[in-house]
Regions:
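Conserved NTP-donor binding/palm subdomain of two-metal-ion nucleotidyltransferases/polymerases, i.e.
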Residues: 1-111, 117-360
Length: 360
């Protein structure tokens, strides 16, 4: 892992890397979803390469270019369908983010497409996806997955349940800027909203992979204007802990990252989040990444708060989420009983949850 971190930090040219170590580094980079970026960093540092490793890096670059072409074409097609429907969506992450932060679509790994539309436009957006061959999955409390062969589109009307983290998505959509992706019109989040979203996205995945932290490192460098103080829009000031933790994690990767958050967090909260960042970073370096389930994720959300009374409000909100959301197992449970309507599924959810309680 140390050699991989050195390459990501721009320190890889300081020593020779044996072929066996290269293979370990490349396997780790693939597992951490940063393989094309590591190759690009090695190229920029002019790291000496044996013929075998040089050939391997060429192969990685070819595969990344082919994959990026596929996802770029898929994103263009979806945006084109939305344009025909009179919709302009905000691509979240994916090829558009790769262009903006990494400099090329082939340098950031994509496995699906995420697009954000207003909640009132979800039905029209779904119809537009159906028209180009997508089929719908089961919606949850803030998005719905759509499928077509090897492509998954996650269609969002929010970026998380507002009871967990209220992104105030309506304000973010109003502030979104006109943009285009390879000639196809779309929208993009304002820089401060995009940075907050990327911090929230990393928290939602519990910083399980280096790719999440590389996104944040580049975002803090390129979306904040450098060392000047960075401030959230007032309506999401309550999410400042996400930025504080995101910056702390980005600095674990790039310690010289210079940025001031305004207003600065209280000293006790800063110490708490720095300690949390230490634990997350140590786990990332020593344990294989595992996507957290819903309960583990919401337990992690509580860790962002100081221990004691500050966690009471989030606990109550998470209980409301647990009681009010419906997910795929709820639909499957209701279907076994012959019920299919969403309101019926919602009514039966408490029964499903109770059926999972172990009997003594």
């Amino acid at each position: 892992m140390q050699c991989l971190l050195e390459l990501l930090r721009g320190q890889g040219g300081d020593r020779a890397i044996e072929d066996a170590e290269w293979e370990t580094v490349l396997a780790l980079a693939q597992a951490e979803h940063v393989l094309p970026w590591v190759v690009a960093r090695a190229r920029s540092q002019q790291v000496p390469l044996s013929p075998a490793i040089a050939s391997r890096l060429n192969e990685i670059e070819r595969e990344a270019a082919i994959t990026a072409f596929y996802w770029s074409a898929e994103l263009q097609g979806v945006l084109r369908a939305f344009e025909r429907a009179g919709l302009k969506a905000v691509p979240l992450k994916g090829p558009l983010l790769a262009e903006r932060l990494y400099g090329a679509t082939a340098l950031r790994v994509s496995y699906d497409l995420d697009l954000l539309v207003a909640k009132a436009d979800m039905a029209r957006a779904g119809d537009a996806l159906k028209a180009i061959g997508f089929t719908s999955g089961v919606p949850d409390d803030y998005h719905c997955q759509w499928y077509r062969k090897g492509t998954t589109v996650e269609l969002h009307h929010d970026v998380e349940n507002p009871l967990a983290f209220n992104f105030r998505v309506e304000g973010a959509l109003r502030r979104a800027l006109s943009a285009d992706f390879q000639g196809q019109p779309c929208r993009q989040l304002a820089a401060d909203d995009e940075l907050l979203y990327l911090c929230l996205h990393a928290v939602r995945h519990r910083f399980e992979r280096l790719s999440l932290i590389v996104d944040l490192q580049l975002a803090f460098q390129k979306l904040t204007g450098g060392e000047d103080g960075f401030q959230l829009r007032p309506e999401v000031a309550g999410l400042a802990s996400l930025l504080t933790l995101g910056l702390a994690m980005a600095r674990r990767l790039q310690p010289d990252l210079a940025l001031t958050l305004q207003p600065p967090a209280a000293p006790a909260r800063t110490r708490h989040l720095e300690g949390l960042a230490d634990r997350l970073w140590n786990r990332l370096l020593t344990e294989p990444g595992q996507p957290p389930d819903w309960r583990a994720l919401h337990a992690f959300y509580l860790e962002l708060e100081l221990p004691g009374w500050p966690r009471l409000g989030p606990r109550l909100r998470h209980l409301r989420i647990l009681l009010g959301r419906v997910i795929e197992p709820d639909y499957a449970f209701a279907a076994k009983l012959g019920f299919y309507r969403t309101w019926q599924v919602r009514m039966l959810r408490p029964l499903r949850l109770l059926s999972r309680v172990p009997r003594r």
